[in-house]
Regions:
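Conserved substrate/cofactor phosphate-moiety recognition/catalytic segment
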Residues: 45-98
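Glycine-rich phosphate-binding loop used to anchor ATP phosphates in small-molecule kinases
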Residues: 78-127
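Short glycine-enriched, charge-decorated loop/helix-capping segments at active-site entrances
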Residues: 72-77, 144-150
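Alpha-helical structural signal in soluble globular domains
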Residues: 49-53, 114-122, 189
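Conserved phosphate-donor/acceptor-positioning beta-strand/loop module used by diverse small-molecule
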Residues: 122-142, 173
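Switch/connector loops and helix/strand junctions flanking conserved nucleotide-binding motifs
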Residues: 67, 135-142, 180-183
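Small-molecule kinase domains that catalyze NTP-dependent phosphoryl transfer to phosphate-bearing small molecules
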Residues: 147-187, 192-198
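Haloarchaeal acidic low-complexity proteome signature biased toward cell-envelope/secretome components but also
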Residues: 1-33, 39-48, 68, 179-198
Length: 198
C-alpha cells in the first residue's frame, strides 16, 4: 500500500515510496499515515477508513491533549508538547511494527515536516492525507457533532487563517459529500476497499 496512484501536490516521483532507500532496512516496521486538515472537515472519518486499510490504531491530538492537560488552554507551548507526544507515540508504534494513523490538524508546516522525517526514517511507509470540506458543510457538521474535540466554527475560521499551505506530496480527500463518496476516495488512494478479514 506504499505507492499511491492518486497524489495531489508537488513532485510525485517519490511519493509514498516507503522505506526502500532507508539504511536501517527494518522490514518489521509498521505503516504510518497522517490525516491533516482544518477542524470539522472530517479527519476522524477519513482516519478510521485508513486505519481499516492498514490494520492500524488511530492517535488523535484531541485525546492526547486531554491526557496531558487537565484544563487545556491551547497555548503554543501546550500545542508543541501535544505534537511532540503524538510523534513520539507514533515513532514507538511504527518501530515496534504496528501500523498507526495520526488524526490531527497539523496546521503548522513544522509539525508536518517533523512527522514526515520520522515516518520516512522509521516507518515501513508514510502517507500524508489532507482532508478538505466545503465551509457550509463544516459549519453544519460542527453545530451537530458531539465528540471529544473542543473545536467550534470560530476555531475552524481561526485555523483557516493560520494553516500553512501543504507543499509536499500528499493525497487530498474531499469530505463535502456523502460518507460513501469519501470512502471511495480513500479506497482509491489505498488500493481498493479494505479487507474485511480483520
Amino acid at each position: 500500500m506504499s505507492n499511491r496512484d492518486a497524489v495531489d501536490g508537488g513532485d510525485t516521483a517519490g511519493a509514498f515510496a516507503g522505506r526502500d532507500g532507508d539504511e536501517t532496512g527494518d522490514a518489521e516496521a509498521g505503516a504510518l499515515a497522517v490525516v491533516c486538515g482544518l477542524p470539522g472537515v472530517g479527519k476522524t472519518t477519513v482516519a478510521e477508513r485508513i486505519a481499516a486499510h492498514v490494520d492500524g490504531d488511530i492517535l488523535r491530538t484531541d485525546v492526547i491533549r486531554k491526557e496531558l492537560f487537565e484544563d487545556p488552554d491551547y497555548s503554543d507551548a501546550e500545542t508543541e508538547a501535544v505534537y511532540a507526544e503524538l510523534i513520539d507515540r507514533a515513532r514507538e508504534r511504527a518501530a515496534d511494527g504496528d501500523a498507526v494513523v495520526l488524526d490531527a490538524t497539523f496546521a503548522d508546516a513544522r509539525f508536518r515536516a517533523d512527522v514526515r522525517e520520522m515516518g520516512e526514517r522509521v516507518a515501513d511507509s508514510f502517507d500524508l492525507v489532507a482532508v478538505e470540506c466545503d465551509e457550509s458543510v463544516v459549519e453544519r457538521r460542527i453545530e451537530r457533532r458531539d465528540g471529544i474535540s473542543d473545536a467550534d466554527f470560530d476555531v475552524y475560521l481561526h485555523f483557516k487563517d493560520v494553516f500553512d499551505r501543504i507543499e509536499t506530496d500528499h493525497v487530498t480527500v474531499d469530505n463535502s459529500g456523502e460518507e460513501a463518496e469519501t470512502f471511495a476516495q480513500v479506497d482509491a488512494a489505498f488500493g481498493g476497499p479494505p479487507s474485511l478479514d480483520g
